[in-house]
């Protein structure tokens, strides 16, 4: 460490040895000049310089050396104080250095192979690899897409990225149009297609959240998701005490089902039946409902059972209080009274934990006008993120073999995913990414409150497709920064004589002001990538994509029929499930011919 400090001290001062030599020779010249006094020596100074510089070696006379060193020190002090008090000029950047990015700025972030990129604009792309040759160019694939209604969020972002087919995809599909338009293409590419349709249950595959419970902490996550995305309509359902009591009750019932129920009864139908069988009487504290008796028998068998411990805490409340809690629970799960929804959630065909194993496309179709069943979608996404993270850590050493991209269109309508601000910060390393698609940033703040900024901060890329919401316009304008411009002022003075004046000065101006962003051309977009100048580019022309001809946009014959696909898909057989296997020879086929 001392050696390094010594180098820093000596090396910058080496040039000042020249001044030691110059002042030394000047002192020698003055000393060698003939003359009895100062004026005489000055008059014959030329003779002294000739004598002094006849030999290039420095004078070793003590006075000459002292003057040489003193002169060099004086020069060093002048340079030091001049540097300390120097004016810091940034010519042309007095008020800011913002500018639009160009092809050279984005070049290090683009993979030469077109298919290995995330499509952002017509001219900008982002490589899928999270480990480029130079680590400083690594960026996460979390993208915040903002665009008002009709700005082309689906056409200019979702569909072009589906056509890249380099990952597994989870797509929120309002109205179900993306599945129809892109399903055939994905099927041709060897993708397994999964569909959860909360608009038309007949066109949906089954999804059973109980099939993905692996531990007691998964039970807690499921209960928290249900409570966060549903409302109990009881008188006191919004108060903290009542919500905590409901949580205990749900944990007890779901814990009982997960541990004790037969495999075909591990679903929400059983949960509803248990809630319906629960009862509390204010006037009879000794009354026991069928559910009370079930837990009593379970306690006799295993007093430390998770479900028993939760239920005993629930029973600490008085009979009247428990009645209110049961009413709130019934109101919260009222949507499950619909038979089609119960049937949808009885069995499971989604195989959520396999999305990172092989290329799969999961389409989550939600209504853009009715959020009644959106809590089911919240449960699915919560389980999906947790399942994939756990599998990446436990099976694949921290990274999934197939990247999973979540294109979360109409993100505000999905509902609240518990701890999403923490999930989005950690999924990157597991080869999972989320594209959050919103109409305005205020939608995110309405759901996630103070955590909205954390979520935005974990998206290295922001793509603005257009809009007029004031908060979004203000934040986009501030994000772009200020540029320095030249201003010319002219003045005219009228009096006895007419005089004119010109004044040039520098001013700071937003690279794009709020009103300019609001009236931005419909074919343009603004892209901001972390660590790079912003881009003002054309939106991606979907018709120029090599695979566009396989979409139903190009040819109606390419429309995907989900009902036909569901009828023809092979049955899902679990590893532990017994089944019969028949071998058919060519001779058997010949015998069957007429």
Task: Name the predicted role of every residue range.
Residues 52-55, 65-117, 216-226, 274-277, ...:
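Short alpha-helical interface patches
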Residues 1-151, 155-158, 202, 482, ...:
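Basic- and hydrophobic-enriched, low-structure N-terminal and domain-boundary segments
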Residues 114-120, 375-383, 476:
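Conserved long hydrophobic alpha-helices within structured protein cores
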Residues 424-526:
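Conserved ATP-driven motor cores of ASCE-family P-loop NTPases powering translocation/secretion/packaging/pilus
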Residues 107-108, 114, 375, 411, ...:
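A short glycine-/small-residue-rich loop at the edge of a beta-strand within enzyme catalytic domains
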Residues 9, 139-432, 447, 452, ...:
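P-loop NTPase motor domains
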Residues 126-132, 231-241, 486-505:
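Low-complexity, polar-biased intrinsically disordered regions enriched in Pro/Ser/Thr/Gly
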């Amino acid at each position: 460490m001392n050696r390094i400090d010594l180098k820093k001290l000596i090396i910058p001062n080496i040039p000042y040895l020249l001044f030691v030599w110059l002042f030394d020779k000047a002192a020698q010249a003055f000393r060698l000049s003939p003359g009895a006094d100062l004026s005489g020596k000055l008059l014959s100074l030329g003779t002294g310089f000739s004598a002094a510089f006849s030999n290039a070696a420095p004078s070793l006379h003590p006075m000459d050396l002292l003057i040489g060193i003193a002169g060099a020190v004086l020069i060093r002090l002048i340079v030091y104080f001049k540097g300390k008090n120097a004016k810091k000029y940034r010519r042309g950047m007095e008020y800011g250095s913002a500018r639009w990015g160009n092809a050279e700025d984005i070049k290090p972030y683009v993979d030469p192979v077109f298919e290995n990129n995330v499509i952002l604009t017509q001219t900008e792309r982002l490589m899928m690899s999270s480990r480029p040759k130079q680590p400083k160019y690594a960026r996460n694939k979390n993208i915040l897409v903002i665009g008002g209604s009709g700005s082309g969020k689906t056409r200019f972002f979702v569909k072009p990225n589906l056509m890249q087919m380099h990952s597994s995809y989870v797509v929120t599909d309002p109205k179900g149009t993306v599945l129809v338009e892109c399903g055939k293409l994905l099927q041709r590419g060897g993708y397994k297609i999964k569909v959860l349709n909360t608009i038309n249950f007949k066109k949906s595959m089954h999804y059973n959240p109980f099939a993905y419970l692996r531990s007691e902490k998964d039970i807690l996550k499921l209960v928290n998701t249900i409570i966060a995305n549903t409302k109990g309509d009881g008188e006191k359902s919004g108060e903290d005490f009542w919500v905590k009591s409901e949580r205990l009750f749900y944990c007890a019932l779901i814990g009982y089902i997960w541990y004790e129920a037969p495999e075909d009864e591990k679903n929400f139908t059983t949960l509803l039946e248990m809630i319906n069988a629960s009862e509390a009487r204010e006037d009879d504290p000794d009354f026991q409902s069928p559910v009370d008796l079930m837990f009593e028998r379970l306690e006799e068998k295993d007093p430390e059972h998770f479900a028993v411990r939760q239920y005993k805490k629930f029973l600490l409340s008085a009979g009247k209080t428990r009645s209110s809690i049961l009413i709130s629970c019934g109101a919260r799960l009222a949507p499950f009274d619909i038979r089609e929804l119960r049937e949808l959630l009885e069995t499971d065909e989604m195989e959520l934990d396999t999305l990172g194993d092989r290329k799969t496309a999961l389409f989550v179709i939600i209504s853009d006008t009715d959020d009644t069943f959106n809590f089911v979608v919240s449960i699915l996404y919560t389980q999906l993120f947790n399942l994939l993270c756990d599998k990446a850590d436990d099976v694949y050493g921290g990274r999934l073999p197939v990247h999973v991209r979540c294109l979360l269109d109409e993100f505000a309508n999905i509902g609240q995913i518990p701890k999403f601000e923490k999930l989005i910060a950690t999924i990157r390393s597991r080869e999972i990414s989320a594209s959050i698609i919103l109409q305005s940033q205020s939608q995110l703040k309405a759901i996630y409150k103070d955590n909205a900024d954390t979520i935005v901060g974990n998206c290295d890329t922001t793509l603005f497709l257009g809009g007029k919401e004031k908060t979004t316009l203000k934040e986009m304008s501030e994000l772009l920064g200020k540029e320095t411009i030249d201003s010319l002022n002219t003045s005219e003075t009228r009096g006895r004589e007419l005089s004119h004046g010109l004044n040039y000065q520098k001013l700071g101006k937003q690279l794009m002001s709020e009103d300019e962003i609001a009236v931005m051309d419909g074919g343009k977009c603004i892209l901001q990538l972390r660590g790079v100048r912003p881009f003002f580019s054309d939106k991606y022309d979907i018709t120029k994509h090599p695979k566009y001809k396989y979409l139903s946009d190009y040819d109606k014959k390419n429309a995907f029929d989900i009902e036909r696909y569901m009828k023809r898909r092979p049955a899902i057989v679990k590893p532990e499930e017994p089944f019969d296997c028949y071998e058919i020879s060519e001779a058997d086929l010949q015998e069957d011919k007429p």
